[in-house]
Amino acid sequence: MKRIPGIFCTALLMFGCAFLGACTTYKASSQVVFDLGELPPAHHNIGLPAMAVAEPNVPPWLDSFEMYYRLSYANDHQVRPYTNSRWSMPPLQLFEQRLKASVAAAGGQVLSSTENANNVPLVLHIDADDFTQIFDSPEHSNGQISLRVSVFNLRNLVAQKTFSRQASAASSDASGGAKALSNASDATIADILQWLSELNLKK
């Protein structure tokens, strides 16, 4: 009879651990995960030379899976993460993947940036400043992207340009923000491809 309290405590402890584990699992599964969706129709062949795309440089707060928004009507200097929504990977990595796919779809050849520099003379470097959903009122927001692209040829700077795009969100939530940022990404990438085609880079 004296062992009953010990057995009871052990059972209670095991139940508590199982309950906490279930709560943790539920919390993880309640997270809604977003990416940038399917690629838009391919651009026409613009005759780009072979190039590599380096891993983007981003501010520390953008180097995460968090989906950020800003309430410009309340405090334009504060970025806030959505509680139950996140990206499938850091957003600028999603952008990098999309840029590479778009370069290839436009007739270019994307090489690995880890290869010998002599084998990859042209490298694109991306420095990101913003990738957020901006609310100008509680009912309306835009997906905003701001970044700088530099073209290097054998480590020599060839050209550099800043790109900034906004796209209106269809809904005032994370889903609307993800779609808006996808549209802003595609518009930015189209601008980048057009700019690259005008540089007359050597093939």
Predicted feature locations:
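Sec-dependent bacterial lipoprotein signal peptides
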Residues: M1-C23
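A structural "domain/chain start" motif
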Residues: C23-L92, L199-K203
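Surface-exposed short loop/turn segments
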Residues: T24-A42, A105-R155, A170-S171
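Soluble periplasmic/extracytoplasmic beta-strand elements of cell-envelope proteins
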Residues: A50-E55, R70, V123-D127, Q144-S150, ...
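Short secondary-structure boundary motifs at beta->alpha junctions and helix caps
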Residues: N75-S88, N156-Q194, L201
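Structured, soluble extracytoplasmic/luminal domains of envelope-associated proteins
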Residues: T83-G107
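Sec-exported extracytoplasmic/periplasmic mature domains
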Residues: K100, A104-G108, L193-L201
